Amino acid sequence: MKAARWHNQKDIRIEHIEEPKTEPGKVKIKVKWCGICGSDLHEYLGGPIFIPVDKPHPLTNETAPVTMGHEFSGEVVEVGEGVENYKVGDRVVVEPIFATHGHQGAYNLDEQMGFLGLAGGGGGFSEYVSVDEELLFKLPDELSYEQGALVEPSAVALYAVRSSKLKAGDKAAVFGCGPIGLLVIEALKAAGATDIYAVELSPERQQKAEELGAIIVDPSKTDDVVAEIAERTGGGVDVAFEVTGVPVVLRQAIQSTTIAGETVIVSIWEKGAEIHPNDIVIKERTVKGIIGYRDIFPAVLSLMKEGYFSADKLVTKKIVLDDLIEEGFGALIKEKSQVKILVRPN
């Protein structure tokens, strides 16, 4: 089968590899659609970050090259011995986190936690993948396979919002309106936030954020983003979400919050960032980070059935696996109009 495999920074190759075997407790899936995640782009441009290179990942026992892709949906084509809840023909989505004790407790914080499609175990940028039964969720009939490929990134956004102190009626700011930032806006709407400010330079992404109901703050049209948010809100937002991975933006996000406000860092960072402790201390603000998600896929699927996280609003391009590098990663690097690109194996 075909698979996109990470070999090194800026070296992802479409290769022919063996189809995965269906071992006991596992389910073999024919991949329908897989989204390109910001983490995939980080690995391509600046990796390895999560991909094991020098020593095997403790749970997959794999090192690079590894098959990439973790935002995917597909159809069950084979079930292993002992699988009870899935049958051939089922439409499914995959929660791609594996941990030492499976999906128990705070499994996203497990020291050995890994992502299928980054730490090994196969990936969605391939024709087939075989995964543990516990990683699967059935895709409701009313949701398309394209919509299914948005469940994983939507889980990141919903988990970020639900992990914050935000209450219905609160004001929020989202710094960065790439795919996750836009999904955070959707999650904030679902949580009952009133005014949602979107801080974004790209006119195309501003338009997407505005279509989702956000109030735009354009850094190119103001001398001071923080002052503008403070003026519009009467002192700052209750919660800010940093979704850029840009050092100067992190400080802006912290400063944009009100007294006792909170900043949630959603980004994965390639390098460090400098902040001034007094930005936190003097107004008794808090800053927290989130990694991935846990126990949230059912909530995402329920919200999708209500119309949130719509693929029609967020998917800007569909490509085939052979075009992943040029039309996928290349487009995301060069074209700021791109939001979510979906890939099908053939």
From Swiss-Prot:
Keywords from the UniProt entry: Cytoplasm, Metal-binding, NAD, Oxidoreductase, Secreted, Zinc
Top-tier EC class: oxidoreductase
Locations listed in the record: Cytoplasm; Secreted
Inactivation phenotype: Cells lacking this gene have no acetoin reductase/2,3-butanediol dehydrogenase activity.
One MF annotation (Gene Ontology) recorded for this entry: (R,R)-butanediol dehydrogenase activity
Cofactor(s) listed: Zn(2+)
Keyword Secreted: yes
Catalyzed chemical reaction(s): (R,R)-butane-2,3-diol + NAD(+) = (R)-acetoin + NADH + H(+)
Cofactor note: Binds 1 Zn(2+) per subunit.
Family as reported in the entry's similarity comment: Belongs to the zinc-containing alcohol dehydrogenase family.
Official protein name in the record: (R,R)-butanediol dehydrogenase
Organism per entry: Bacillus subtilis (strain 168)
